[in-house]
């Protein structure tokens, strides 16, 4: 480790970055939840995504900041993330290792119900359940957006993506 200029730190019982226990028991790490063979997302990160989706619909409802077209683009970005300057951003990109597809279908259903409540054509909305596969495909265009149509900077967009993730 010295050759790599890395320092080995003592294991701290009260540390929030390390823990020990039986590997057969559920545990959480970096926003993920591991339980048997299921890799999911920690509950706080799921709730944060729901809250951010609701926030987006509320801003649209109150006609704050964007048109219907921009709302749909922003919602799709929230669902799929995107590639900016060759780097993948977004909730689904961060949690691309999950195999909890039930969670993704529940999120899709929540978005569908919200679209119905706000008179948004759900056919125009991308799906969490598809994005998980598309994020792993280097040739996909599912994550391609014309970001110049948005009234925000790339930097602000990246910060919005980080706001969706609760990994601490």
Residue ranges and their predicted role:
Residues 2-37:
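Conserved catalytic core of two-metal-ion nucleotidyltransferases
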Residues 23-168:
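Right-hand nucleic-acid polymerase module
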């Amino acid at each position: 480790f010295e050759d790599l200029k890395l320092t080995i730190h003592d294991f701290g019982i009260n540390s929030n970055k390390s823990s020990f226990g039986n590997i057969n028991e559920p545990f959480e790490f970096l926003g993920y939840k591991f339980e048997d063979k299921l890799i999911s997302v920690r509950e706080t990160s799921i709730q944060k995504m729901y809250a951010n989706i609701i926030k987006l619909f509320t801003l649209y409802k109150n006609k704050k900041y964007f048109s219907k077209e921009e709302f749909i683009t922003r919602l799709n970005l929230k669902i799929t993330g995107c590639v900016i300057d060759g780097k993948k951003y977004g909730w689904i990109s961060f949690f691309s290792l999950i195999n909890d597809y039930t969670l993704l279908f529940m999120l899709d259903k929540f978005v569908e119900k919200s679209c119905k409540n706000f008179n948004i054509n759900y056919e125009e909305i991308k799906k969490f359940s598809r994005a998980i596969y598309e994020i792993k495909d280097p040739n996909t265009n599912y994550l391609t957006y014309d970001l110049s149509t948005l009234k925000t900077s790339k930097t602000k967009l990246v910060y919005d993506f980080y706001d969706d993730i609760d990994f601490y």
